[in-house]
Amino acid sequence: MTKILTSSQAEELHKSIIAYLSSINASRSCEVLREELQVDSSFDDALCRKYEGLLEKKWTGIARLQKKILDLESKLAGLQTELDTISPTARSTGKDPINWLPTSSRHTFESHRDAVTCVAFHPVFTSLASGSEDCTIKIWDWELGELERTLKGHMRPVSDLDFGGQKGHTILASCSSDLQIKLWDPNKDYANVRTLSGHDHSVSAVRFLRQTDNILISASRDATIRIWDVSTGYCVKVIDSQGSWINDVSPSFDGKWLVTGGRDQAAMVWEVASAKSVASLIGHENFIECCVFAPPSSYKHLAAIAGLKTAPPASSSSEFIATGARDKTIKLWESRGRLIKTLVGHDNWVRGLLFHPGGKYLISVADDKTIRCWDLSQGGRLVKTINAHGHFVSCIRWGPVPVSDVPVETSESTKSSKSDSVKPGFQCVIATGSADSSVRIFT
């Protein structure tokens, strides 16, 4: 016990035990303990009475704390069950989440006064943030279809949004043409808790390096990528692309790599640790609007498209990349720079891309007002087109995907179809934003 307690804590415990035994007239036990615990004669009857009741108080206090912990654990389990039940996952609606694709919209949110440029889902709650050229951010309950609040702070159009931060302390990051990045705290009614300054031109995109991380990545038309520690507000690294405008940035799932795309028509792959470019993806004939790393769940399909005999290990986070551009095409790449497929079908600028968490589909939006779904298991064939909005579709995001749903490498990862799949724990919900000033939810 004395190895766990400090000397003063141990002394207090010994005296409390002696005082308790004295109060119940166990005099022989008191004498033995005084000798064994080496409590000197200065601890007389008057001092002993000051310690009476202390042991009982601590004992009952521990019992109350144990009961409170059990009650809180039970309450937490109940809330988690309620959350899992309320959230309209494909599983809860009897659908197959691996093959789920959006159909008609469930909600249409209309409150912005100008084009919606970006959307982002809260990782835990049914909250959705949308940013607009009207310089505001709006927070919606996408489950109930209600507007919760409007955030004002940016002086020019909001360019991008992302939720992140350490577990239990989620932060919303926003960026704008006003050259600033703002951090908003959902736990404080979305108060603007910090403003990050440093870019010399419009900030195009923000992404947290990992879902539960304090590191934020920003990309700008000043041709730089900045890495920020949101807990301090300091810029910890600047990467100079030595090129032109950067329109988009996307981190790999482990946070070790970045892909950027912009005005020079090339996508670049960067190693975060060294801040060096490791590959250039050259092939588009106009500005690149969006870029994203493929999840490991899609590796087997992309490996087949690339003509590889075996898929890369699922533990690798940066094997394949998709880019979309103003040349109306989507290109699929090996991250080392080899073009493996060009997807043609959109009739206008491609503005947003995401991979289905199940790995089978790539979903895109464009200024042709549509959402298009491409089946990677069929070589990237266009299998579905949805007329999503009445004007340009500017952005798309998938609902929260638990980190545990990203597969890990096993010895059979390239042989077993079971190990290649993602556990269907993700929510099948998509949000889009449009130049028609609306946000739509597809479930």
UniProtKB/Swiss-Prot annotation:
WD repeat windows: 111-152, 154-194, 198-238, 241-280, 283-343, 345-384, 388-427, 429-443
Chief location: cytoplasm
SMART domains given in the database record: WD40
PROSITE patterns cross-referenced by the UniProt entry: LISH (PS50896), WD_REPEATS_1 (PS00678), WD_REPEATS_2 (PS50082), WD_REPEATS_REGION (PS50294)
This protein's UniProt keywords: Cell cycle, Cell division, Coiled coil, Cytoplasm, Cytoskeleton, Microtubule, Mitosis, Repeat, Transport, WD repeat
Domain notes: Dimerization mediated by the LisH domain may be required to activate dynein.
Protein family per UniProt: Belongs to the WD repeat LIS1/nudF family.
Subunit structure: Self-associates. Interacts with nudE and dynein.
Protein name per the record: Nuclear distribution protein nudF
Organism name: Aspergillus niger (strain ATCC MYA-4892 / CBS 513.88 / FGSC A1513)
Gene: nudF
